[in-house]
UniProtKB/Swiss-Prot annotation:
Broad class of where this protein is predominantly found: cytoplasm
Organism encoding this protein: Arabidopsis thaliana (Mouse-ear cress)
Tissue expression as described in the entry: Expressed in hypocotyls, leaves, vasculature, hydathodes, trichomes, pedicels, sepals, filaments, mature pollen, stigma papillae, styles, siliques, root and shoot tips, but not in shoot meristem, petals or root epidermis.
Note, other: The expression of QQS varies considerably among natural accessions as well as within populations directly sampled from the wild. This variation correlates negatively with the DNA methylation level of repeated sequences located within the 5'end of the gene.
Compartment(s) where it occurs, according to its Swiss-Prot or TrEMBL record: Cytoplasm
Name this polypeptide is given: Protein QUA-QUINE STARCH
Length: 59
């Protein structure tokens, strides 16, 4: 089990939010939308948003 700081460092290295990341999320959303039910998209969107939000909240 990693300590909180080790976890943060791992997250920082593996995921740096920036404009291209946001753009990728939008592209993924656009690709997924036609292929899934609305509830599936909403669930996925909430999961991504809450995960990204948590990363910022931890700093």
């Amino acid at each position: 089990m990693k300590t909180n700081r080790e976890q943060e460092i791992y997250v920082e290295r593996s995921f740096k939010p920036n404009n291209s990341t946001i753009q990728n999320l939008m592209d993924i959303e656009r690709f997924i939308l036609p292929h899934t039910s609305t509830s599936g998209v909403a669930r996925l969107k909430m999961r991504v948003i809450s995960w990204v939000g948590l990363q910022f909240y931890n700093y």
